[in-house]
Amino acid sequence: MDGVTVINHPLVQHKLTFMRRKETSTAGFRRLLREISTLLCYEVTRDLELTVETIETPMVEMEAPVLEGKKLVFASILRAGNGLLEGMLDLVPSARVSHVGVYRDHETLQAVEYYFKAPESLSERLVIVVDPMLATGNSSIAAVDKLKERGAVNLRFVCLLAAPEGIKNFREAHPDVHVYTAAIDSHLNEHGYIVPGLGDAGDRMYGTK
């Protein structure tokens, strides 16, 4: 599918299966989400630019590659996006962080924005937007809209699960933003939830209803 990468790594798929199971505990779900996020981060950042600095090993001085972390921003769509954010920051602790507060109105299924905070100079940074679910796509579209309004031009979107409807809507709204996902599920139900899915990621992560 154009503009979409499905990450089929065996460890990702194995852990995703355990996250889908309805009997998985809140603690287990949260742990698995953090573990998967590190694997997704590995894939989505494989082409990040490196710079060189001079270091001393126990043997000699050498020129060695290091990541330009200050050029990277992780943008979490609250609240469930924080589950992906934590694992990614484990790998790139020097990255900047943005939070976009958007929730889906359960009656209209439209996105409602309530919070936004981002680093300066977004136009100079790669912005990786994270949210476990790409369902209708409305919340993700709204979040990327806001980031672009603040100057972001180089963005990627990372999720655990995506519905075909959400991918279609998101790609139509933001054809310049590549989507990375662990799986593309069958469809959305009448309530806008991904089927077979894994339920509400935020509720399962935080033990709420």
UniProtKB/Swiss-Prot annotation:
Catalytic activity, reaction form: UMP + diphosphate = 5-phospho-alpha-D-ribose 1-diphosphate + uracil
Where is uracil bound in this sequence? Answer: I194, G199, D200, A201
Name of the featured protein: Uracil phosphoribosyltransferase
Q: What is its EC number?
A: 2.4.2.9
Pathway assignment reads: Pyrimidine metabolism; UMP biosynthesis via salvage pathway; UMP from uracil: step 1/1
SUPFAM superfamilies in the cross-refs: PRTase-like
Please provide the record's keywords in A-Z order: Allosteric enzyme, Glycosyltransferase, GTP-binding, Magnesium, Nucleotide-binding, Transferase
Q: Which GO terms describe its molecular function?
A: GTP binding; magnesium ion binding; uracil phosphoribosyltransferase activity
Q: How is the cofactor bound?
A: Binds 1 Mg(2+) ion per subunit. The magnesium is bound as Mg-PRPP.
**Which top-rank group of organisms is this from?**
Bacteria
Q: Would you kindly state one Gene Ontology biological process term found in this protein's UniProt entry? A: UMP salvage
Q: What is the lineage of its organism?
A: Bacteria, Pseudomonadati, Pseudomonadota, Alphaproteobacteria, Hyphomicrobiales
One Pfam family of this protein, by short name?
UPRTase
NCBIfam families recorded: PRK00129.1, upp
* Family named by the database record: Belongs to the UPRTase family.
Q: What does this protein do?
A: Catalyzes the conversion of uracil and 5-phospho-alpha-D-ribose 1-diphosphate (PRPP) to UMP and diphosphate.
Its required cofactor(s), as named, are: Mg(2+)
User: InterPro entries, alphabetically?
Assistant: PRibTrfase_dom (IPR000836), PRTase-like (IPR029057), Upp_B (IPR034332), UPRTase/APRTase (IPR050054), Ura_phspho_trans (IPR005765)
What does the activity regulation annotation say?
Allosterically activated by GTP.
* Residues annotated as binding 5-phospho-alpha-D-ribose 1-diphosphate: R79, R104, D131, P132, M133, L134, A135, T136, G137, N138, S139, D200
